[in-house]
Design a protein with these regions (language model features):
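NAD(P)H-binding glycine-rich loop region in Rossmannoid oxidoreductase-like domains
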Residues: 1-40
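Helix C-cap/helix->beta junction micro-motif
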Residues: 13, 54-55, 103
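NAD(P)-cofactor binding segment of oxidoreductase domains
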Residues: 18, 32-60
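SDR active-site strand-loop-helix element
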Residues: 18-22, 59-65, 71, 110-112
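Conserved catalytic-core motifs of eukaryotic protein kinase domains, centered on the activation segment
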Residues: 28-35, 70-74, 121
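Catalytic helix-loop patch of NAD(P)-dependent Rossmann-fold dehydrogenases
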Residues: 39, 43-47, 67-110, 115-116, ...
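NAD(P)-dependent short-chain dehydrogenase/reductase
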Residues: 98-151, 158
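Mid/C-terminal beta-alpha module of Rossmann-like enzyme folds, strongest
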Residues: 159-200, 212, 220, 225-230
Length: 230
């Protein structure tokens, strides 16, 4: 697909809203294949922004909490802070945000957290925190936790439900997902460093878009699937 082909397809469809969620989001793969990832994570979203500006469509795109990777500041992180992401994926997403807004200032960019759901409807699903907790409970496995890792994780159904009002937000960047002030899962307990990806979503709440806290969201998900009493 070329940029011209993409612009022609969008011009023919005349959409009111374009929702862009695709990315090469595996941080390890992105480190190993930065050029391939750059095309998916920066160039193609930029083409969409130019096409949206040309046809007058509203563009909503997903960024990532990985833009905050490497920050030393404690507490919930606002959209306005200076950023210098510590990994390739975070740097690419930050560049994507800047270039999309330059091309189409009306674009809404959502810095999404790690998300989760439980297996259902025959759809593929990757490992996630609630699923790992359920497996550990059922099979008597041990999990490791650390006080050095902070991030919110979000029930994907709530993220989807909030996309409709998000499409009406003013153009700009928004932290999007469940907040979390508690320690999160860290696979290597002995590593002596702290990671903080916990985002301040107050800007989003100012427009009436709300998420459960990370803890509330997990209970919400488990209740939806009838496994809260495991």
């Amino acid at each position: 697909c070329t940029e011209l082909q993409l612009m022609q397809s969008i011009a023919e469809a005349q959409p009111d809203v374009i929702l862009h969620t695709a990315a090469i989001s595996d941080t390890g793969y992105t480190e190993q294949h930065p050029e391939e990832a750059y095309r998916a994570n920066v160039e193609l979203p930029l083409w969409l922004a130019r096409a949206a500006a040309q046809c007058g469509a509203r563009l909503v795109g997903f960024s990532s909490d990985q833009v905050y990777a490497g920050v030393q500041q404690p507490g919930s992180l606002p959209e306005t802070m200076e950023l210098s992401p510590a990994n390739v994926y975070g740097r690419q997403k930050l560049e994507m945000e800047q270039r999309m807004l330059d091309a189409c200032p009306d674009t809404v960019l959502l810095r999404a957290t790690w998300m989760y759901d439980l297996p259902s409807y025959g759809l593929p699903i990757r490992g996630n925190l609630p699923l790992n907790l359920i497996k550990a409970t059922v099979y008597g496995e041990k999990l490791r936790f650390s006080n050095c890792d902070y991030r919110g994780i979000t029930y994907v159904r709530q993220a989807v439900e909030n996309l409709v009002p998000a499409a009406d937000l003013p153009g700009g960047v928004y932290n999007y997902g469940s907040g979390n002030a508690e320690n999160m899962v860290c696979l290597i307990e002995a590593v002596d460093w702290q990671r903080n990806l916990a985002m301040d979503c107050g800007k989003l709440r100012g427009y009436g878009i709300r998420f459960d806290t990370t803890q509330e969201g997990i209970y919400h998900c488990l209740n939806d699937y009838g496994v809260a009493d495991l």
